[in-house]
């Protein structure tokens, strides 16, 4: 059962879930997928299944209690919390700002660092910490998510928690009940944050999600909370279908990005390179095609599909696998479980977005490696003996 929660099988089932959601007719905006659409998604799923069968025949993961790593969440939580408090003092609260998060300014680079450190705190508390430490770190994450409208942080945090809990307590049957409860809680909270974000932007109306999602009679029967979930899982897959079709229909898919029609440069800067770095060097950020303008999320594969079609997506999956292998080798053995769980959490969200290239999520890998190196060094050993 562990394999179902870990990369790459968790991504396989996430993509399968997205595919299945697009078969439900809940919106006037979207059509049932064509055979070509289904075939392309099927190939993506086969790629992850191939990696699982032939390359990652992982054994059962056991989380060994570690007193050194158990309390590392505390300094991480303090640093990130202080950083966010400073931002709130300097720039105000996005929740109360006119225009919401879209017009909010933050401390360059440091905001990304605070974000990454907070996620690290959640990772280590979920894997090694007590119930108290988990509650504290999640309470802080929840507050930050609401104040800054960072639903991605909240979703990734819950996924990290669920994977960690399942691995830590998989021998107990009650863990399945707890996981279902947290999924339900996340569903309700997700829809709540979606509503208050639109309210802060000043464009909220009753049953807002029905309006932006083009809900038909079947869709309204779901209720707003479940319709939010269906819309945010299905609409990226629909947009992925569209980007595949646009690439297939255009004679030169990249002529809109540069005069020579070069696809390679935008592929590197948008699909492979962390966006914090690509923005710093001035690389062009491309936009994907979307069926509905305001629902412009297209999974983590849409940009690759827009540039190179199915070949671009398969290349992306291959590069992602190589990244996992190289990162696993470079990560100190003491924290490889942490690395695996975090990578698995991000890979699950490929049905929403490519979080691997988002700076705030990418730099978490570096922090994990630094912590692993620090706790494996002679300096740390001597320091702990003196303590």
Regions found by a protein language model. Name each.
Residues 32-35, 53-168, 183-201, 286-287, ...:
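Membrane-embedded catalytic interface detector for glycan/lipid assembly enzymes
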Residues 190-316:
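Small-residue-enriched transmembrane helix-hairpin modules in multi-pass membrane proteins
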Residues 1-82:
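A structural signal for hydrophobic alpha-helical transmembrane segments in multi-pass membrane proteins
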Residues 11, 15, 42-46, 80, ...:
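Alpha-helical transmembrane spans of integral membrane proteins, capturing the lipid-embedded, hydrophobic core
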Residues 135-136, 151-159, 174-179, 219, ...:
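Hydrophobic alpha-helical membrane segments of integral membrane proteins
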Residues 55-58, 121-129, 237-248, 321-326:
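Transmembrane alpha-helical segments in integral membrane proteins
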Residues 2-14, 68-77, 130-136, 176, ...:
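Membrane-interfacial loop-to-transmembrane alpha-helix junctions, especially the N-terminal start
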